[in-house]
Amino acid sequence: MGVFWYPAEMTPSWNNMIRCMLFMVFFAAAGSCTAEELEKNLGLQLEANPPMQVIARTPPEPDIPAGDFETREGYQLITSLDEFRQVIKKDGQKIRLKPGIYRVKTPDEQHEGKQHLFAVHGSNNRFDLRGTVIETPVSAQSLLTTKAHVSSCWRVYGSENTFIGGYFRNVLDKPYPKYRVADNEFEILGDKNRFYDCTFVIQGSVPYGYTDFFGKGAGGGGGRLDKHSCMAVVNADGNRVEHCKIYQHSFGHAIHLHSVDGFLAKDCFISGVLRPTNDIFKEKAGRAKEFDFKIQYRGVRPIPRDEMIPLTESGIRTYEKVRDVFIKDTIVERMRGCYALYGVGKIHLENATAREAGDFAFAITSRSTGKATMKDCHADLAYNPVFNFTRGELPVRNDYEITIHDPPEDSSPTPRTGLGVICGDKCHFVIHDATTKPLPRGFDRLVCGDKNRPLTRSEVINQTTATVVLEKNVENCVIRSRGPVIDQGRRNRVIKIRSREATKKRGSRE
């Protein structure tokens, strides 16, 4: 497929229009609006506050056929949500759900202490959902338990099911914050399930608008925390998400993996939400005002000014015992960590793009028992670092290749803008330069080594003009750089590269 930096539907002019929005309109709204025409979404913020300033992309409208529709040979036509709830519990079917909009109102039957709106117990099914919209409103989610890790809108127990063309969206039919949401829209517990050409519109979480300033998982001291992720894959192997779009507009992950052996995301687009921290100080009521505009998570301190924060968690995130993850031809934008993959086995990214990262673009590591590889990947220098190798296992014998692109025309660097931090042992880093203008002075730095995480016996090829800083724990490395190098380490070899062409040729992995 090749590099797709700005596909036709994601042109810079479209991005600029979205940036002009003072707040996200209801997702059902169509067409463009001026700032004056936009109103607060009271499902996402308190009425007492001014419209929240965000950078977000409006999800596309679903394509629902007005007349005839296709039912493929061998498929059973289902015309109601009640029927659909029953057939997803059976095996070996081909089901066609009649196009239209369906809204669930009540929970499904509990199973093994778990609560959900839909329970897919069946296996070896094909669900043709083209032209259908299945809505899970917060009013229905509020009927589920408030216990952590117990509720999901959809729980897929079965294996080898295929979901084709579905449009799944949350509806904010209660005012913020007078609702509760399920932990995940989808929780996948079976093996070898596949989502193809599906769209997920995820919204609704409490609090909203502050990233993790008031908590994230255990240990938060900032009051009630009700997160909502799109998809969790738990103790399940060989699942696939292909040609799908996720609009993650709530505080939660787009996709998170736990104890997984084999996962593929291919030709996907994941879009989150950003907010300038200066906008928080305009609030008259709510969580920030209650805590005197101070962060309550991992220490009490003032909310920083002049930064850009994500209102979501990570795009694709791994947790314990994850191996054999393959990400290809995928774009993640405006998420906290676009790709946060910490594996015990193989982690491979190919043509994976990160844009306008909310905290960092890439944190890719694997233990010495596996290998992490980034091939032909892409990122910009909009607001936050490209690399964050300060967490997870220290990379060993991993390969990283990335191309740096221009940020959006109307973006401005923040105090956190830069190439970030890399660490590892016997690793190979190649950083290509596709920018058309100089990197912002003062924000053009790549730091090698971090506190107790060294960079040793590695090669770094820096094609950009960024300054490479070698910390004291950088040893026995070869640094080929177009930009300046500050060497505070030991026994390193620094080689000046005079043009980006020379770097590209030398750094080629072909």
Residue ranges and their predicted role:
Residues Y6, P12-M17:
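Short, positively charged and aromatic/hydrophobic N-terminal segments
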Residues C20-A30:
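Bacterial N-terminal signal peptides
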